Regions:
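Extracytoplasmic/periplasmic ligand-binding sensor regions of membrane-associated signaling proteins
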Residues: 76, 81-89, 93-178
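Juxtamembrane extracytoplasmic/periplasmic/luminal helical "stalk" adjacent to the first N-terminal
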Residues: 1-103, 116, 120-125
Length: 178
């Protein structure tokens, strides 16, 4: 749909400028602090839920966290760690923080209700918007740990999701799905 195309354009562009916009708005909270706080989510709520569901700790959680880019840390911090909704309900957040006046926050507030409604209506697991050049997940309804990572060289590059992305990326223009 033209709505989804516009959303992709807006998310893709604002994804690139978000770090600068957020640093200006937040001032003192540096990347190291955000990284520590986000790590507490990986080890805490996420790690505990993983243990409850699987009877063991995730062996890959350190590898996943250590492969996060500064960009991914900023996005996951804003939309996962600093999200007041509990694990499994992160999708209920429309705007990360009322003080966040970034282009990305405005795009999220505009498009997220539409994608959330579409997901619920059709029963999808999640809806992702992925930058076709960088492989970065620039938007996700559910904001799980793959959010804001690259499917080309990030922690999920060697998953089925990463493989599917690369397969689609390799399709020639004449063969593209319309």
């Amino acid at each position: 749909s033209s709505f989804a195309i516009e959303a992709m354009k807006d998310f893709r562009e604002s994804f690139k400028t978000y770090p600068e916009e957020v640093s200006i708005l937040e001032g003192s909270k540096d990347l190291r602090q955000k990284s520590r706080e986000l790590r507490s989510y990986y080890d805490g709520p996420f790690g505990e839920e993983f243990l409850n569901r699987n009877g063991r700790k995730s062996e890959k959680i350190n590898d996943i966290f250590n492969q996060l880019t500064p960009q991914a840390i900023r996005f996951q911090h804003s939309f996962i760690w600093d999200n007041p909704n509990p694990l499994g309900s992160k999708h209920l957040l429309n705007r990360p923080n009322q003080a966040d006046q970034s282009d990305y926050a405005r795009a999220h507030e505009t498009y997220h209700p539409y994608f959330s409604s579409f997901l619920e209506r059709f029963g999808y697991y999640d809806i992702f918007l992925v930058d076709p050049e960088t492989g970065e997940i620039v938007y996700s309804v559910f904001k799980e740990l793959d959010y804001a990572t690259s499917l080309l060289d990030g922690p999920y590059a060697d998953t089925n999701f990463g493989e599917a992305f690369r397969a689609v990326q390799g399709i020639r223009n004449s063969e593209r799905v319309k």
